[in-house]
Structure formats: C-alpha cells, structure tokens
C-alpha cells in the first residue's frame, strides 16, 4: 500500500513534481457538467460582454449587405434601359472606382495615423483637425439617415405594390413600422445585428442565384422578358435616354449602391484586428459587388426589351425563377442597408459627442452595456430618419444621398493626400536648404558629438574639469558628513552642507567627472530633455526628504551623490549619438509592406477628391451648393463654440501654399533657398588647455606657470606706433 499512495495522490491532486499533464480523476465529469446547458430562464438574450468580430463575419458581410442594396434590385433595369449595356458597365465600374479610391484612401489614412473608433469622423478629424472632422462627421450622419429613409421607402413601396395599395400614407406607415423594429434590434446590441446580417446575407445570395438561374430557364414575353438574343443585345448596347435623363442623372440615382463601402471603417470599435479586418473585408466586398453588378447589367440587357427596362422597375422579378425569392432579396437588402446606417451613424455621433466637438451634443456620448451602445444617439438618428421617410420617393432621396456621400468621400480622399504630403515635407532631404542637414529638436542633444580637434571650443565636460583644477574640492568633508548622517539621521536636517558652485554646475549639466577621457563620445553626450530631468529631480528630492524627515520645500538641491546619479543619462541614451525622440500626439507613420498598401496613392486620392466635387455639381448643383453652405456654417460654428480642437496630423501642410509654390515653380526658375544658421539655446562654450613646451631637460629649470604683466595705455600706443 505504501507504493500505491503516491500514485493516488498524483491522481487526486492533479500534479506531482511539477507535472501539469495529469488530470484529476473526475476531470471529465466536471468538464461535462460545465458544458451542460443552463435552464431557459437563465439564458441571456441581450449582450452582457463585449463581442468582437473579424474580416468575414463582420466587415465583409456588413459591406456586402449595404452595397448589394435596394438600388440594385429596383434600378438596375432602369439603368440599362437608359445607358445601354456598354455604358451601363462603364457607369457601374465608375461608381465602384470612386468607392474604391475612397476605401484605399481610408486604408492609407489608417496605415499612416492611429485611428479611433469613430470611423469616417476619426479619419478626417485625425488628419485635418477637429473642426473639419466634426463638420464632415455631422454631414455623414445626415447622409446615413437620408440613405436609411430611402432604403425603407423602397421596401415600403414594394410591399404596397404587392398588396395593391397605392396610398402614400400606407407606404409611410409601413416605413415607420419597419424603422421602429430596426431601432429595437439596434438597441439590443451589436451581437444581434451581426447575427441577423449573417442570415440576411445568406438569403441575399439565394435570391441572386435565383435571378441568374431564372434568366435561362423560362420566358415571359408579356412583361418584356424574351430570352437571350444577339439582336436584342445589339439594340441594348448603346445609350438611349428618356426625356430629362442623362449619364450624370442616372449616375446620381445609382451611386447610393456604393455608399456602403465605409461601413467597415465605422465598425472599427467592434473588430478584433481593425488594421487587417477593414482592408481585407472592404476590398473583398468591393470586388464581389462589382462582379455581381456587371452580371446583372449584362443579363438584363441580353434578355429584356428596352421599353420594359425603362418603365418596369420590377423587371428583375419577372426574370427570376421564383419571384418570391427575388422579393425576399429586395426586402432583405432594404432592411439590411437601413440597419447598417442605423448602426454606423449613432456610433459616429457618439464619438463626436464624447470628444465634445459640439458641446451641446455632449449628452449623446453616453453608452449602455459592455459595447457602449449609444442609446441616445440611436434615438436621435432614428428621429432624423423618420423625418425623411415622409418624403417617400426613392428618386428624390437618391440624389441627396449621392451628393452628401460625394462630399464625404472627397474629404476622405483629401485627408490621405494631405497626410502623405505632410509626411513627405517632414522627411524631405532638402529641408532647410541643405541636403544632409539635421533638424535640431528639444529631445536631441544641443551639442552634437564630434571628436575634439585643433581650434575647437571644447565641451562643457572639459570646462567643468578645468573648474576642478581652479577650485579644489574638499574631499575630506564628505566622509564626515556621511558618517554623521549615519550616526544621527535626525541631525541631518540641520547640518546639511551647501555644495560649491562647481558641483552645482555638474548637477545642472548632468556631467560625470569620474569617467576618463577614454569614454569619448559617451562622456560628451548631453541630454537636454529638461522636462524629464526636472520631474526626476523633484521625485528624487521628495522621496529622500520624506525618508529622512526633511521638508521638500526647504531646498531644491540634491542631498547626495545618489541624486546626481539619478540625473545621469541612461545606457541607452549614452550608447547612441542621438537621443530617441518622443512620439508626438499625431505621428505620421510610413506605409506598411502589405499588398493593399501598395495601391494607396496620394495623387490618385487627390484626383478622386476633385472628381467627387465636380460630380456633385454635375448631378444637382443646387443640392451641392446647399451641402457646401451647410458645411461652411458647421465649420464656423464648431470653430466658435470649441476653438481649442486639435489641428490635425497634416496641420503643417497648406493646400493654398502648395498651389502658390507650384505656380511659382511653373512661371519662373525657383530662387536659391535661403540658409539660416540658427544657434542653439545652449551654446557649446568650453575651455581647453594645451601644453606648448615639451617635457625635456632643456626646459627643466623653467617654472611651470604663466607670466603676466600690466601694460599702460602709453606703452601700448608706443609699441604699435
């Protein structure tokens, strides 16, 4: 039995001699009991702990549902009927290209700057400053609310047509009921939103497959669906606009199909790894959406007549194999797109309120639950969406959404352009007019380390060593004071000796006189980060004074050599000729080596910003002017109520100054840059002694001292006359 007891002890206690692989006898039973389901009354329906998502279950799904929206199901046939197949594919590609440039610009901003959880607002605010970021953020929230109203209205129109109810108030009633239901899901938490989106995404895929299969399995000539025909495709290839329509009006109606590309940025606070999840998920969603759009345009142009494409908005339902599945996809896309807007807009509004960009909205910054669900912001955005529901027409709301989002995308594109130009200005080799100049900063040594040569002024360390030779320190007093301190610590308060001027100079300049000249550059390093040294000095003095019963306000000088050692440069600082700089609040970083970072180009972003502004005015110049006017008013208001907002990471880059400099360069040859020699705040003043006579027998009898004599004014004048 004596041999069995140790083994039994091992099995019961789970370990012996540090072994961690041995389990308890009843480990399996305990594990099974932990995995058993709880009673139904203890199940938590709502989210009580933070939930984070990844690339495919979070970003890709949300972007696809928002991009693959009601515009695709209701307006693709109308687009083909006006622009034709060829120009329709060009228009779809152009819409996706504008969205792609904006996504790449957003990825570039996230790569270069640290972005918070505010999505579009955080990107613009970090780069262009709080005033511009707050202005664009408010306009983006407004656009999301209008887009949500448009999606709900499209859903209500389809339901009313299905029920043969053409009353406008029926459409509005259905829209309000749906909006209230979506607000309830949003309040339940982000976990339920993502779960519902996964189900909706699956149903969307089924409805799309139903449309593709139905295009070659049956015909419906009475409703314009005549099947594949080469002649029909030739007739539908080129544009033939209805009266009052043009390429840009069609673009304005169809562009909201791509407004969901920024959803991934808006949910950055709920992602596991935003720096990886957002780029991969957004780019994958854009590529998939472009392919499906092109398939829809080509199929509708090859199987349907132009007249029905123009005037029958539900032509895609006639093509589908099972019309109910297509309607299900339409309903789901409408609800999902609206839910995406109701998810992103309140969180951006919450971020703006938390940063107190607009002090009047600070009460909206509160959140409920572990994911900080913005309850108050959800209600505000819901009311704003409800107000636009009463307009009740998709073709009226679509241009408003387009122009608002074009302004937002232009701001994102310009943000990446400006932050890249600012980064290049900071790292330009021709800065200060010299190709190899080094910029002095408060965290770099004011005295650059060079070897001592003939004619040099020396260093502060050498100057202090000369002071040692002039004022001999009394080395015999230190042991006595130390011993007296050890004998009676209480008397140290009253018998504290005052240090000579030489030692105070040593403490001020952090010089170590115990190191020999063989240390070279290490002994000459002067750390000039005064803020850190002062904080260290005060902490060291207060700590020592508390330990020894001394009032810290009684003296500002260090009490012993240990205090001087605290101020000495660290080994990391002495090992290099330059001191590592502090990371500023808005540090612009270099692009990573990822594959998507290679496609981020600031010139393309700049062209995208200009193109977005031009498209705004071409689509509807009145709406464009109204948006710009509201943006200017918001900018001035935010600057007035909160003038102390951050200037942004690209504050040193001025667009107008860059334009003026470019104009001067084009008009005439650039003038040679002026070079300014700026002396540092602490000059490298020092003294150096040199022995002019050699050590040999010829001069052995000569005294080792210098002679001096007084010369009167008359003798001085006579000597040089």
From Swiss-Prot:
Concerning InterPro entries, the annotation shows: AA-permease/SLC12A_dom, SLC12A_fam
* A GO CC term assigned to this protein in UniProt: membrane
Which ranges does the record mark as transmembrane? 53-73, 84-104, 115-135, 136-156, 174-194, 196-216, 247-267, 283-303, 321-341, 374-394, 397-417, 606-626, 628-648
Q: Does the keyword section mention Chloroplast?
A: no
Q: Which UniProt keywords apply?
A: Chloride, Ion transport, Membrane, Potassium, Potassium transport, Symport, Transmembrane, Transmembrane helix, Transport
Cite the record's Acidic residues compositional bias ranges: 553-565
State any GO BP term from the record.
chloride ion homeostasis
Membrane topology (UniProt) = Multi-pass membrane protein
Cite the Gene3D superfamilies for this sequence. Amino acid/polyamine transporter I
Give the subcellular location: Membrane
Q: Which family does it belong to?
A: Belongs to the SLC12A transporter family.
Q: What does this protein do?
A: Cation/chloride cotransporter.
Name by which UniProt lists this protein: Solute carrier family 12 member 8
The species this protein was found in: Xenopus laevis
* Organismal lineage: Eukaryota, Metazoa, Chordata, Craniata, Vertebrata
């Amino acid at each position: 039995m004596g041999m069995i007891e140790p083994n039994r002890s091992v099995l019961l206690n789970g370990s012996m001699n540090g072994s961690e692989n041995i389990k308890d006898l009843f480990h399996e039973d305990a594990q099974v009991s932990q995995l058993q389901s709880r009673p139904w009354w203890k199940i938590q329906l709502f989210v009580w702990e933070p939930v984070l998502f990844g690339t495919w279950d979070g970003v890709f799904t949300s972007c696809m549902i928002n991009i693959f929206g009601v515009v695709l199901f209701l307006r693709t046939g109308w687009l083909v009927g006006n622009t034709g197949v060829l120009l329709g594919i060009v228009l779809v590609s152009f819409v996706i290209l504008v969205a792609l440039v904006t996504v790449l610009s957003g990825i570039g901003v996230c790569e270069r700057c640290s972005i918070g959880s505010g999505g579009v607002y955080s990107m613009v605010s970090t780069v262009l400053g709080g005033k511009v970021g707050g202005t664009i953020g408010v306009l983006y929230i407004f656009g999301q609310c209008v887009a949500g109203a448009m999606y709900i209205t499209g859903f209500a129109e389809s339901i009313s047509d299905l029920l043969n109810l053409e009353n406008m108030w029926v459409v509005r009633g259905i829209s309000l009921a749906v909006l209230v239901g979506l607000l309830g899901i949003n309040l339940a938490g982000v976990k339920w939103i993502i779960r519902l989106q996964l189900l909706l995404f699956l149903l969307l895929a089924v409805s799309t497959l139903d449309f593709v299969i139905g295009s070659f399995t049956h015909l419906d000539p009475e409703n314009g669906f005549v099947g594949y025909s080469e002649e029909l495709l030739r007739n539908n290839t080129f544009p033939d606009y209805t009266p009052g329509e043009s390429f840009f009006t069609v673009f304005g109606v169809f562009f909201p199909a791509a407004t969901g590309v920024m959803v991934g940025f808006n949910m950055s606070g709920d992602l596991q790894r935003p720096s990886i999840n957002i780029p991969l998920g957004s780019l994958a969603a854009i590529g998939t959406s472009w392919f499906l759009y092109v398939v829809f345009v080509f199929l509708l142009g090859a199987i349907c007549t132009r007249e029905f494409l123009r005037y029958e908005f539900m032509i895609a339902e006639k093509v589908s194999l099972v019309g109910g599945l297509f309607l299900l996809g339409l309903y789901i896309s409408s609800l999902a797109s609206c839910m995406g807007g109701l998810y992103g807009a309140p969180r951006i509004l919450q971020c703006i309120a938390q940063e107190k960009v607009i002090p009047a909205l600070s009460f909206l910054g509160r959140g409920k639950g572990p994911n900080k669900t913005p309850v108050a912001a959800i209600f505000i955005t819901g009311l704003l969406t409800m107000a636009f529901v009463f307009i009740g027409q998709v073709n009226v709301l679509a241009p408003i959404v387009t122009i608002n989002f074009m302004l937002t995308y232009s701001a994102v594109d310009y943000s990446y352009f400006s932050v890249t130009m600012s980064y290049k200005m900071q790292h330009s080799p021709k800065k200060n007019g010299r190709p190899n100049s080094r910029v002095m900063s408060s965290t770099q040594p004011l005295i650059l380390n060079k070897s001592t040569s003939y004619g040099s002024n020396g260093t502060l360390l050498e100057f202090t060593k000369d002071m040692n030779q002039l004022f001999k320190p009394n080395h015999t007093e230190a042991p006595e004071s130390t011993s007296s301190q050890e004998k009676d610590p209480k008397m140290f308060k009253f018998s504290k000796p005052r240090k000579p001027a030489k030692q105070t100079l040593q403490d001020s300049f952090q010089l170590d006189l115990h190191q020999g000249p063989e240390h070279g550059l290490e002994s000459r390093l002067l750390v000039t980060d005064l803020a850190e040294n002062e904080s260290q000095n005060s902490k060291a003095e207060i700590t020592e004074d508390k330990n020894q019963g001394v009032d810290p306000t009684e003296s500002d000088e260090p009490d012993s050599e240990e205090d001087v050692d605290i101020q000495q440069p660290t080994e990391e600082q002495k090992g290099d000729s330059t001191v590592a700089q502090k990371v500023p609040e808005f540090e612009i970083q270099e692009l990573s080596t990822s594959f998507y970072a290679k496609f981020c180009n600031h010139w393309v972003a700049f062209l995208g910003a200009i193109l977005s502004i031009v498209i705004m005015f071409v689509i509807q110049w009145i709406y464009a002017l109204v948006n710009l006017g509201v943006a200017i008013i918001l900018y001035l208001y935010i600057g007035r109520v909160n003038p102390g907002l951050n200037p942004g990471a690209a504050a040193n880059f001025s667009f107008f100054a860059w334009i003026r400099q470019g104009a001067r360069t084009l008009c005439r040859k650039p003038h040679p840059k002026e070079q300014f020699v700026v002396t540092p705040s602490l000059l490298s003043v020092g003294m150096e002694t040199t022995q002019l006579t050699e050590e040999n027998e010829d001069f052995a009898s000569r005294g080792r001292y210098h002679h001096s004599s007084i010369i009167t004014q008359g003798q001085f004048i006579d000597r040089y006359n």
